[in-house]
Amino acid sequence: MTWQNDYSRDYEVKNHMECQNRSDKYIWSPHDAYFYKGLSELIVDIDRLIYLSLEKIRKDFVFINLNTDSLTEFINRDNEWLSAVKGKQVVLIAARKSEALANYWYYNSNIRGVVYAGLSRDIRKELAYVINGRFLRKDIKKDKITDREMEIIRMMAQGMLPKSIARIENCSVKTVYTHRRNAEAKLYSKLYKLVQ
């Protein structure tokens, strides 16, 4: 009986993920079925708080889960995923450790807004606020990663050592360590833990 339940559950999860990978889906990451289900239900739940129809949201918006499990992929491929969502209204859902990166992408690309999941007293209102287009630069609640820090984060995510990074960036190894330390303070974590 347990084997059949496990098999059934695996089939259900696999089927759900395949559905999420279709181009008409508006929630990333395809690997997080709980996030997908929870956010889908939350968007339907806040229907009365938003100005747009649910159909327009499904068509024009992309909601991206920036959690610690997916950060490496987003860091290594930020140009790719930003290109893939071009023309869409992108909403980043940021966990505490990814807030500074979310702010970086908000400032440096065409992101509609950021929902800070860790700070939110009422995530429904925050989500509606962003969907309705009211999120502005003044709403940024935390520091953002600088361009130099982001370059160092990218290189470290690729497995490069500080000495190699210093050579490429034409700076001292001490400067690399300083930028890394500053980024870690903004991300509330050691970089090696985030970019494994």
UniProtKB/Swiss-Prot annotation:
Cross-referenced PROSITE patterns: HTH_LUXR_2 (PS50043)
GO molecular function annotation: DNA binding
Keywords: Activator, Cytoplasm, DNA-binding, Transcription, Transcription regulation
Disulfide bond sites: none
Pfam families documented for this protein: GerE
Recorded name of the encoding gene: ecpR
SUPFAM superfamilies, A to Z: C-terminal effector domain of the bipartite response regulators
The keyword Transmembrane is annotated on this UniProt entry: no
InterPro entries cross-referenced by the UniProt entry: Sig_transdc_resp-reg_C-effctor, Tscrpt_reg_LuxR_C, WH-like_DNA-bd_sf
Natural source organism: Escherichia coli O81 (strain ED1a)
Protein name: HTH-type transcriptional regulator EcpR
Similarity comment text for this entry: Belongs to the EcpR/MatA family.
Entry annotated with the keyword Chaperone: no
Predominant localisation class: cytoplasm
Compartments where located: Cytoplasm
